[in-house]
Amino acid sequence: MLNILLSAILISTDVTPEIFFPSETITPARIKSEIVVVKDLNANTKPYAYFSFATGKDVAATEAKTRKWDIAFSKTTIAVNGGTSGPGQAGAQVLEQPFELIKQAPKDGYKTDSESGTAIPGGSGSSWYKYDMSVHAILPIVGRTILIKTAEGRFAKLEIISYYKGSPEEVPTEESSYFTFRYSLSDENGKF
């Protein structure tokens, strides 16, 4: 009833309502990127254990020739969905910078897997891990972060936390090839 009365008043007085639009552009606050922790991804498989950053889940090996995965693990080898390993746009680089300090994904420097090796180099001390001969353990190198350009062209930063089942704090005696890692996806501008 009130709406009818207001409409009648507006029509009878020939008043056009004004709509206010602010003159300055309002930019929404940037949402801080989420950090996801994946525990005990079993990489004791052949050929690989495939993983998607977008879904936060492993991907069936039958999807290896698709863009549904970004990164794959087999023992200490890490492959990306690009180059010789898959049809995606993925690439990687290892930075000697702590995970928390990386706020922006580099625009270049990403390598793809090739016949001569993976984008993320293997071998003790040359990438994400070192082999400690005194305790016969594979240990992540503190302060190393892997930057990934995903299969779809976005960016993720990744830190390997443990290579052993259950992420033991002491000298590992548990099963190996069980990756625990944390990652964060960037926004569309490559910011974390």
Show the residue positions of the predicted features.
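Short, well-ordered, aromatic-rich surface patches in folded extracellular/luminal domains
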Residues: 163-178
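Glycine-centered tight beta-turn/hairpin loop motif at sheet-sheet or coil-to-beta transitions
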Residues: 151-155
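Short conserved beta-strand and strand-loop elements enriched in small hydrophobics
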Residues: 144-150
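Sec-dependent signal peptide recognition
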Residues: 1-7
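N-terminal "domain-start" segment
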Residues: 11-144, 166-169, 183-192
